[in-house]
């Protein structure tokens, strides 16, 4: 199986001298094709930094990032931008929906930018929204949607097309427990059915139990990893010393 995301001894520091902060320290991981990986850890542990570096949105101070086996270390900014647009979908806590576009237009825009016809892009967007229970909200603008609905639009946008990787930072943060489970189920199914690779940051052990593998991070260091075969309770025990903020 192909390593779709690979970090090799990645470190990230901010500032200099006494003010230097080490957000990541020699983090190494790999996520293979079709795998769903959850990342858990306390606030400020480096989870979001790990995700943005894995998605080539941020440069590591040292170390190397590979996407689908290809190092991005010496790529030009233009080539990285092209890689992101064609290969990686992002879902962050701030939804970044364009206020002047409808839900369907927000979802179809990345496809159109990549050369898909407007008509075909709309068909794909409507199908994606319908799959997330938003078929009747496709013509609504972001300010006409609830926070949970906007989050689902962002998830649909990240997954449309032939994206091989989806990176999600607390993708269910604005959703209730039922819709949160539905989102994780959808991501898990997409990984198994299409070979997509997903990396999801979450504080919720119940949601992390949908992943094939869970990585624990603390103080910028990957401290452990496990398969959640025994369910969320085993993750809570595993993470007790790593993340006191886990839902109990």
Label the model's feature ranges.
Residues 2-217, 222:
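ABC family nucleotide-binding domain
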Residues 221-248:
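Conserved beta-strand-loop-alpha-helix hinge in the C-terminal portion
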């Amino acid at each position: 199986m192909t390593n779709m995301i690979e970090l090799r001894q990645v470190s990230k520091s901010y500032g200099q001298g006494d003010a230097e902060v080490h957000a990541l320290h020699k983090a190494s991981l790999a996520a293979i094709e079709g795998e769903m990986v959850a990342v858990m850890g306390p606030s400020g542990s480096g989870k979001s930094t790990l995700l943005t570096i894995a998605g080539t949105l941020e440069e590591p101070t040292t170390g190397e990032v590979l996407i689908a086996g290809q190092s991005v270390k010496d790529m030009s900014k233009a080539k990285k931008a092209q890689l992101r647009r064609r290969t990686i979908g992002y879902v962050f806590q701030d939804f970044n929906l364009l206020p002047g576009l409808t839900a369907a237009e927000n979802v179809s825009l990345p496809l159109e930018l990549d050369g898909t016809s407007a008509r075909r892009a709309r068909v794909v967007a409507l199908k994606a929204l319908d799959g997330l229970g938003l078929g009747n909200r496709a013509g609504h603008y972001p300010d006409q949607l609830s926070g949970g609905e906007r989050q689902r639009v962002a998830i649909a946008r990240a997954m449309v097309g032939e994206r091989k990787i989806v990176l999600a930072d607390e993708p269910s943060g604005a959703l209730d427990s039922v819709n949160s489970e539905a989102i994780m189920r959808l991501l898990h199914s997409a990984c198994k059915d299409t070979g997509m690779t997903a990396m999801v940051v979450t504080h919720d052990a119940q949601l992390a139990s949908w992943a094939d593998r869970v990585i624990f991070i603390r103080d910028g260091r990957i401290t452990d990893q496990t398969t959640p075969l025994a369910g969320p309770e085993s993750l809570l025990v595993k993470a007790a010393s790593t993340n006191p903020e886990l839902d109990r």
